[in-house]
Amino acid sequence: MFLAKSLVCLALLAVANAQFDTNYASGRSGMVHLFEWKWDDIAAECENFLGPNGFAGVQVSPVNENAVKDSRPWWERYQPISYKLETRSGNEQQFASMVKRCNAVGVRIYVDVIFNHMAADGGTYGTGGSTASPSSKSYPGVPYSSLDFNPTCAINNYNDANQVRNCELVGLRDLNQGNSYVQDKVVEFLDHLIDLGVAGFRVDAAKHMWPADLAVIYGRLKNLNTDHGFASGSKAYIVQEVIDMGGEAISKSEYTGLGAITEFRHSDSIGKVFRGKDQLQYLTNWGTAWGFAASDRSLVFVDNHDNQRGHGAGGADVLTYKVPKQYKMASAFMLAHPFGTPRVMSSFSFSDTDQGPPTTDGHNIASPVFNSDNSCSGGWVCEHRWRQIYNMVAFRNTVGSDAIQNWWDNGSNQISFSRGSRGFVAFNNDNYDLNSSLQTGLPAGTYCDVISGSKSGSSCTGKTVSVGSDGRASIYIGSSEDDGVLAIHVNAKL
């Protein structure tokens, strides 16, 4: 027993510190989840919008062949049939081209990978033409047979770690990641994506797999492909989906030695704050004091594709595009604050939580339509193209690693702070105006508020803020304004 534990510890140590670097290009920060976008459209978006606006990466939807389900719900992408790169988003050639084109403009690609399970019963035909028999645990496209799965049982008790990790999540056939053949197939799949130039992975349902098995899989992965601009010896950035709101048998701390985790507490807490259930003044110690994992272990977000639909964690407190004022405020705070690695959600609009992406014919995904103001139509929300969000990605890039300084609050729901002497933000979530002289920490001058507008040459399309020689400025945010936030930085100086 001692030997087995020692081997697990050695495996964990071998992986330690390798998976925490995002592999972002220099001077960039902020990832966007282009949920259900096609590969060709993502490539164009990298070149036309994400690259020029300072985004660092894209999380893409699952790349492997999935079960074709009636009505084509979004969640069919999470029911693997094989590891062939053939989905509604495109084929392997299109995927490879996208990765190459995005890397060429400094935007990294992170793949949502699924190897906890295979498709549930009913998933007999895949997007790449493969067939399967989930009822007999036969997936010839890999191939997997019943020998590669855990015994059939349901997860009914989240206080039983064995059940959570060895039984089936909502009927999805549960792979045995301790099986050496399964490990070989998973590593082969991930290594192929590394060869194609990806920078990392979001590991779906990591909580449902044993950390020791994941350590073995991660530890076997190739270094990143230097042909795509990665430094020699770079490892894939690993983000593990681990929902830990406390009170269950499985803790995120079991996974943070292996890679980052999806910090759902951040989503839940930021939703409560900007919905008015907690006061903004309490954000003064935002971070691990709120129960979050360490900053370099936390992928943070306002919402994700699951919890914007009431799945996952957070419930009714989660903010989504459907409450735009508060959503933009929460997103601006996330991007202005140094904690964690932020991921912006880019959604399609939905009224039914099973609804799939916009299509041209009920099956083929439609491309987003872009309006003159950068926003999207055609059923796509494109939060990443909202000025209040993409300008805050530029803010984050501008302030870099500068610390929070000059914190101010009114004892309620009005706050402001600077990031060193490079950026300043103020928020008003009270039902009365914010009208105060505040210390911005910035050099004297006139600045463009990048929330209400953008700098255009030597002018500003939105509000301007005059900072005096003492660093102070009169800050006004009316309670009835469209945006409850104001942001200025040194690259928006007029």
Curated annotation (Swiss-Prot):
Residues the entry annotates as binding chloride: 202, 304, 343
Keyword annotations: Calcium, Carbohydrate metabolism, Chloride, Disulfide bond, Glycosidase, Hydrolase, Metal-binding, Pyrrolidone carboxylic acid, Signal
Signal peptide: 1-18
Enzyme class: hydrolase
E.C. number(s) listed in UniProt: 3.2.1.1
Cofactors demanded by this protein: Ca(2+); chloride
Site (Transition state stabilizer): 306
An example Gene Ontology biological process: carbohydrate metabolic process
Gene Ontology molecular function: alpha-amylase activity; metal ion binding
Binding residues annotated for Ca(2+), in chain numbering: 116, 165, 174, 208
SUPFAM superfamilies hit by this protein: (Trans)glycosidases (SSF51445), Glycosyl hydrolase domain (SSF51011)
S-S pairs: 46-102, 153-167, 376-382, 448-460
Record-annotated active site: 204, 241
Cofactor binding, note field: Binds 1 Ca(2+) ion per subunit. Binds 1 Cl(-) ion per subunit.
Catalysis: reaction(s): Endohydrolysis of (1->4)-alpha-D-glucosidic linkages in polysaccharides containing three or more (1->4)-alpha-linked D-glucose units
Gene3D superfamilies reported in the protein's UniProt record: Glycosidases, Golgi alpha-mannosidase II
Keyword Hydrolase set for record: yes
Pyrrolidone carboxylic acid PTM positions: 19
Family to which the UniProt record says this protein belongs: Belongs to the glycosyl hydrolase 13 family.
Subunit structure: Monomer.
The protein's name in its UniProt record: Alpha-amylase A
Species of the source: Drosophila mauritiana
